[in-house]
Design a protein with these regions (language model features):
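Small-residue-rich hydrophobic membrane-insertion segments
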Residues: 62-142
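Cytosol/matrix-facing juxtamembrane amphipathic
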Residues: 2-65, 114-181
Length: 181
């Protein structure tokens, strides 16, 4: 029987793939609404996706997502004051890394784990880190394919089983693919 007050070490990592910025933003907002901070959200996307969706269109409203994407790309904090919640989250997280050879942006606790692996181990380290977080290898392969196709992978280590169920439901409702806990 699941106890909704279990610690995060016993609660699942919820992961999902989002094919567009709008669905990723809504999923991120569902996490934020439950009191999770930007440093608790793992985001993986290609550098091309970051440039396409979070590069600072002056017609957009400032948001957390765009700034976080900018920092993940190594270009600093706010980017012209114009992006979404995920981008600001990318910028606000203390640890985010750009992997130039792979064209990949990683932010959140996962970035810290990868940074600890050292630059030489990042390529294999990403798959290993995701598998190490309890994500089955076949799902990691689907996520990798989705990232290459312009998607955004989000992951959150839930604090409670109730939170995990809530995130899974909300992310699926917001067009998340391969959403699991």
């Amino acid at each position: 029987m699941s106890n909704p007050n279990t610690s995060s070490s016993e609660s699942p990592m919820v992961t999902g793939l989002f094919r567009d910025r709008e669905s990723a933003e809504r999923a991120y907002e569902s996490v934020s609404a439950r009191g999770y901070g930007r440093d608790e959200v793992n985001l993986l996307m290609s550098d091309e996706t970051r440039k396409t969706h979070f590069s600072g269109d002056a017609s957009e409203v400032t948001s957390e997502l765009g700034s976080k994407a900018a920092e993940g790309a190594g270009i600093g904090g706010a980017i012209g004051g114009t992006v979404g919640a995920i981008a600001a989250a990318l910028a606000a997280v203390g640890t985010s890394i750009a992997i130039p050879g792979l064209g990949l942006i990683v932010a959140g606790p996962l970035a810290a784990a990868l940074a600890g692996a050292g630059a030489g181990g990042l390529t294999g380290g990403l798959v290993g880190a995701l598998v190490g977080w309890g994500i089955p290898e076949e799902r990691v392969i689907r996520y990798e394919k989705g990232i290459k196709e312009g998607g955004i992978v989000m992951g959150v280590k839930s604090r409670t089983a109730e939170d995990a169920t809530h995130f899974e439901s909300e992310w699926k409702r917001n067009r998340g693919e391969d959403v699991y806990q």
